[in-house]
Structures are given as C-alpha cells and as structure tokens.
Curated annotation (Swiss-Prot):
It is a multi-pass membrane protein. Belongs to the complex I subunit 4 family. It comes from Microtus pennsylvanicus. The keyword NAD applies. Core subunit of respiratory chain NADH dehydrogenase (Complex I) which is composed of 45 different subunits. This is NADH-ubiquinone oxidoreductase chain 4.
Amino acid sequence: MLKIIFPSFMLLPLTWLSSNKKVWINVTTYSLLINLISINLLWQNNENNLSFSTMFSADPLSAPLLVLTTWLLPLMLLASQNHIKKESEHNKKLYISLLVCLQTLLIMTFSANELIMFYILFEATLIPTLIIITRWGNQTERLNAGIYFLFYTLVGSIPLLIALIYIQNWTGTLNLILMTLDSSPINQTWSNNILWLACIMAFMVKMP
C-alpha cells in the first residue's frame, strides 16, 4: 500500500515547490499516475496476491474504494480551476494541499487493518473537508453548512466509537485480519441490532 500512500503524500512538497504556472499541471498529472498505479489493485483477487501488513492492506472489498478515491484529486482539480482562478497563488496551493491531504487520509482509511485506526483516519478527513467548505464554498451559507457538518459528524461518530469499544471488549481485538479467524457464531439479538445501527450511523451522517 505504500506505493499509493507515499506518492500521494509526496504531492504536498510537489505542490509548494512547483512554480505558479505549472502547479496545476504537475499535481494533476502525478495524481493521474497514482490512479493508474492503483488500478493494479483490482487484479489482486486472491489472498496470495495481497500485501498484508500490520497496518495497511487491500482486499477485493477495499480495492475498488481505493481506486475511486484516487480519482478524487484529479477530477476535483480539473473541476475547480475556474472557480478559484481569482485567488492568490498561496491560497491556490493551500487549496490543492488540502485536497491532497483529504485523498491521502481517505486512502489510509480504506486500507487500514485496525478498526480504531480506521475510526481516527475517518474522522481526520473532517478537518480538510471542513476547511474547504468554509473557505471555498460556493454558497453564502457555507459557514453555517460547515458548522452543521462539524456538529452532525461529531455526534454521529460517538456511537461508532462506543461500538468499537464494545467490539474490542467482546472479541479482544480490532484487527480485521484476526477477526476473520474468529469462528464464534453471531447471536441475532436486539443488542447486535443496536450495535449495527451505531456502526452505520457515522457513515449515514456523511452520506449527504
């Protein structure tokens, strides 16, 4: 997974070291190259081809999400150039840096093996998203939208954290690879339904 995470992170120094005229071309081109590299994950259909590690890995479920995430940066760069063309060069590079941070955090989120790491990275995406909404939002109500986004996201993430703590106490681990080795049956009780609702609530809040 480092072949995707590390190049995505290195887009930050590329953004600030590139000249003002070439920063859009450089970041867009290299982000498209990262996307082409990530497409290789779609052909890793069996466990022998997966590069497992204690922190990050890709499987047939997360690989399509990773490929879609790598499309996020180049498409947003192409769509927003005209919108922020009147901004200063410093603000343009700051905007690109926030998009790069958002993509890197999303890649690490979808490839995380530990559920608590997934939770931390998933909530960390709130920071660049909130700054982009409140600073470069197109509507005049962007500040109110940012406040509502922050409030609903934090409120929706608390049940997910409680559910993860409960899973940790129940199974003894939050590692997804180790949890697949657990063959204990899942009881269909009302508490498990509440647990499922708590886990899905954080994603439903961010869906809009």
